[in-house]
């Protein structure tokens, strides 16, 4: 089957920066960025249970009061980190499907981008969909989440502002596509696909399995 997309290069893992010395001063904006970077390192290393304001301050090498001044509480920190995740997530999906010529190819490329992002950023991905830990009243998170949804909606050929009413047919198509790739990503992160992949011919993995499900070309990894 001839691809109608150019193979997207594998997204680079977000650079992990070393811990900054406690004595190093921060500009106001740089401090916020440093706190988010520290929070992401903790999230990927220790999981959401290990991410507290005190732990983030210690990781960034700043006073314990610093994260509270910027984010209010741990829910605020998690929400801003999730917003950053959704922004990077949307960019990865758009980049993956940029050269696609058909709706089917776009959906396949976005599906691969969706699962690849989850595979490379498991802690951040899980946080982004932990609604009970996030505050969607925060403008940054609400806007970033809506933008990610619009990427998926656009892939099936629906265009319009986020508050535009959807027909049942369009809503069903968006939900079907979203459920497929999100469910696959969750099964993969939980390790539930490993026994299935182990029974497949050599040279196959979760991504080739996803390609077979989506019916599109599997990008080079």
What is the predicted function of each stretch?
Residues 61-71:
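Short hydrophobic/aromatic patch on the recognition helix
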Residues 136-142, 146, 159-211, 220-221:
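Hydrophobic/aromatic-rich alpha-helical bundle segments in the mid-to-C-terminal region
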Residues 84-107, 139-147, 160-163:
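Amphipathic alpha-helical linker/stalk segments
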Residues 95, 128-135, 194-195:
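Short linear capping/connector segments at secondary-structure termini
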Residues 29-37, 44, 49-50, 70-94, ...:
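An amphipathic alpha-helix adjacent to DNA-recognition modules
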Residues 1-46, 54-55, 59, 76-79:
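Basic, helix-initiating cap at the start of DNA-binding domains
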Residues 1-3, 7-10, 156-157, 187, ...:
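Intrinsic, short, N-terminal disordered tails of RNA polymerase sigma-factor systems
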Residues 94-124, 145, 167, 173-177:
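Hydrophobic alpha-helical connector segments
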């Amino acid at each position: 089957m001839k691809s109608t997309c150019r193979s997207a290069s594998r997204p680079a893992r977000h650079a992990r920066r070393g811990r900054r010395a406690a004595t190093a001063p921060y500009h106001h904006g740089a401090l916020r960025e440093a706190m988010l970077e520290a929070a992401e390192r903790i999230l990927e290393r220790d999981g959401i249970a290990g991410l507290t304001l005190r732990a983030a301050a210690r990781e960034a090498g700043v006073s314990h009061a610093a994260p509270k001044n910027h984010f209010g509480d741990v829910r605020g920190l998690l929400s801003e980190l999730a917003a950053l995740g959704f922004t990077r997530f949307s960019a990865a999906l758009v980049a993956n499907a940029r050269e696609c010529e058909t709706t089917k190819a776009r959906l396949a490329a976005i599906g691969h981008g969706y699962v690849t992002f989850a595979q490379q950023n498991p802690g951040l991905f899980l946080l982004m969909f932990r609604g009970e830990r996030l505050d969607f009243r925060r403008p940054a998170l609400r806007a970033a989440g809506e933008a990610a949804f619009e990427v998926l909606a656009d892939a099936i050929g629906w265009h319009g502002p986020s508050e535009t009413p959807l027909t049942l047919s369009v809503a069903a198509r968006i939900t079907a596509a979203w459920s497929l790739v999100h469910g696959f990503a969750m099964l993969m992160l939980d390790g539930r696909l490993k026994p299935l992949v182990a029974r497949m011919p050599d040279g196959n993995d979760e991504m080739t399995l996803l390609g077979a499900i989506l019916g599109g070309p599997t990008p080079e990894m």
